[in-house]
Amino acid sequence: MANILIQGATVLTMEGPDGVYRDGEIAIAGNSILSVGPRGSVPEGFRPGRSIDGTGMVAMPGFVNCHTHAAMTLLRSYADDMPLMKWLSEKIWPVEERLQPEDIYWGTMLCCLEMIKSGTTTFADMYFSMERVAAAVEESGMRACLSRGMIGVGSGARKAIDESLSFVREWNGGADGRITAMFGPHAPYTCPPEYLKKVVDLAAREGAGIHIHVAETRDEIEQIRAGYGTTPVRYLDAAGVFELPVLAAHCVHLDEGDIEILSAKRVGIAHCPESNMKLASGIAPVTELLQAGAAVGLGTDGAASNNNLDMLEEMRSASLLHKVSTGDPLALPSFEALRMATAGGALALGLKDVGLLKPGMKADLILVDFRRPHLCPQHDLIAHLVYAAQSADVDTVIINGKVVMEKRQVLNLDEEKIMAEAQKRALRLVNRE
């Protein structure tokens, strides 16, 4: 792996609003960042194998998508304008029963292609046939936290535990350390207490985290309250789930006590504003969570409920949503939205070596081309990234010290083949008996 020197870019480190070098340099040695600073700050003796001219670009950490279902790209536009439970029970779950492992592989490849082209370098995924998901991640060069979704009721409950355990043991730390394997109990309403306790015991024994949907809809709140007399957050806390590293997706319907628990237990939260809006699930109390010190990142959710995987759009939607819903134009300002999409997302995933541009961090970064009419004039770079930038502005993507996209060309994936396979398999899937 050749050392890389990036020169001339405006470097946005994400260590704070003032962490900006207008004529900056980034030295990458192997898969890590060696130095970041103004031009001329590269350590003496550093010999790059290649140099990248960043003139007119902003260099920044790659986006961290904290919650998605990668292979659901195959179901993009298949089921729209429906409430969550009807969407799941009538459209999504029936067609998912017909998915084959190779469908999931190609759906994940399409996901990785789309995410790379829009500047995402790390994502968290929950699905099934996770060995094929991991294979796609390994091939794409991306970084990912992967979990096999587990339904704790019905005939497949035991199989989900067995497959999850096998996956964690085989893939945790895989793909040169780019894959983190987790356990994925689906949600409080699909996982009874005794099942959750089994998952917690396994995760603790294996040293793995947990990825779970939490308090996504009012139906879930009512169901858990009717069955257990409590909230989904308290239900999970009583089962011992929050004693482990946890990524909780959605967290829409929370009371003050729930927020206190999530913050105190250092639960990572994946805020998915566009999916929540589209399914009319509600608006997560993100400003309250942030004020309580919770670790909040952004996620797109799956392409079947978003309908894209564009973190630039997700940032903009998040910031605007919380301004209009609170009546406060200062709610979720641009730097906070950008932090949630980068360093905050890494923190929510428990990844300590991504999300910032500083020495010792993994070399996961992107170059955004600011030589665009919609990014001119450049009074505030951070505001531009959140309110004006588009995915097509992402010029270069580097993951783990390897250039995976340059001048909008993804170097290690066959774009045409991936799209053709995905289109073919998606049509077969929805017509398959």
Swiss-Prot record:
- Name the cofactor(s) required for activity, per the record: Zn(2+)
* The protein's Enzyme Commission number: 3.5.4.28, 3.5.4.31
Question: Where is substrate bound in this sequence?
Answer: E96, R148, R158, H186, E216, D301
- Cofactor details (free text): Binds 1 zinc ion per subunit.
Alphabetized, the UniProt keywords read: Hydrolase, Metal-binding, Zinc
InterPro entries attached to this UniProt entry: Amidohydro-rel, Deaminase_MtaD/DadD, Metal-dep_hydrolase_composite, Metal_Hydrolase, MTA/SAH_deaminase
Gene Ontology MF terms: 5'-methylthioadenosine deaminase activity; metal ion binding; S-adenosylhomocysteine deaminase activity
List, alphabetically, the SUPFAM superfamilies matched.
Answer: Composite domain of metallo-dependent hydrolases, Metallo-dependent hydrolases
Give the catalytic activity.
S-adenosyl-L-homocysteine + H2O + H(+) = S-inosyl-L-homocysteine + NH4(+); S-methyl-5'-thioadenosine + H2O + H(+) = S-methyl-5'-thioinosine + NH4(+)
**Listed HAMAP family:** MTA_SAH_deamin
Family (UniProt): Belongs to the metallo-dependent hydrolases superfamily. MTA/SAH deaminase family.
The record's function comment reads: Catalyzes the deamination of 5-methylthioadenosine and S-adenosyl-L-homocysteine into 5-methylthioinosine and S-inosyl-L-homocysteine, respectively. Is also able to deaminate adenosine.
Protein name (database record): 5-methylthioadenosine/S-adenosylhomocysteine deaminase
To which species is this protein native? Pelotomaculum thermopropionicum (strain DSM 13744 / JCM 10971 / SI)
Gene giving rise to this polypeptide: mtaD
